[in-house]
Amino acid sequence: MTRLPLFHSHAKRREAGGRTETIHLPCRLIALDLDGTLMALDLKFSPRVRHAVAVAQERGIAVTLATGRSPLSTCPFAAELDIRVPLICYQGGLIAQRDGRLLHRATLESHLAAQVIDLAQSHGWHVTLYQDGAFYLPELRHPLSFYEGFLNPSVHQVADLRSLLDHDPDKMIIIAQGNGDEILAGLREHFDGQMQIVRSHELFIEVNPLGVDKGSGLAWLSNYLSVPQAQVMAVGDQDNDAPMIAWAGLGVAMGNGSPACKAAADWIAPPLEEDGAAVAIERFALNSPFTK
């Protein structure tokens, strides 16, 4: 059996006299954000990222993707990296196998979704909705390729999103147009304590079911795989990644990460353009420098 490398977890115990000692454990699960962490706007993985993920899996470490994307949008990237364990999608609201089999799902209550639609329309915000694997919007404000590439391959234009609310949607996204701070503040003012509201990108303000975030999703998957929290590593770059970075035994923020993401992290990796995610995997899970 392959011996797992020592994982330099930041889980600590307090010794007598105030001394703190770091516990070294083997890494058994790595959760990786996609956009801004593993790939840039070109949606491509670098050779170094591919290599680090492949070696980790060869050594018996489970690697998953933790993203706000839908399963339909996530699975092609998972296939490229040959991810073998369930995927964390919709910010932790849905966990599924690569073959599409659902393991866990939380949905946004329809009456709350209707209120978000009303608020968005009153302000002229670009509101969109995910339901049953498809992506819906009332109008196109960007080229179709924008929605297909960054949000979901299955895009449907529906004049009134309320017509879809005969059952609960998975989540909603309001696409900012230079007004992201205003949207975030407005949603939180009206719906604080009723739903999870988070910024996942400069352009994307997400509305998820209350209690759903990448931290809760990673905790669910860790339990499903019987991996202790202390042996989990998470890497991300945005505010929506902060919960899983804070929850993991070792949380890593990208050098290009948001302030909230970095504040939650145990270690700051180099930025995306310097393959920061691969560097983190090599350093903390593989304990070896990258070699071609």
What residue ranges belong to the model's regions?
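Non-catalytic pre-domain segments flanking phosphatase-related domains
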Residues: 1-32, 58, 227
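Mg2+-dependent phosphoryl-transfer enzymes with acidic/Ser/Thr/Gly-rich catalytic loops
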Residues: 21-29, 46, 206-292
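Conserved acidic, metal-coordinating active-site core of Asp-based
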Residues: 119, 123-247, 256
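Short, structured coil segments at secondary-structure junctions
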Residues: 81-83, 90-91, 98, 190-193, ...
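Active-site phosphate-binding/coordination module
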Residues: 42-144
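Short active-site oxyanion
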Residues: 60-64, 83-85, 170-172, 230-232, ...
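Short hydrophobic/aromatic-enriched beta-strand-loop microsegments
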Residues: 84-91, 105-106, 197, 251-255, ...
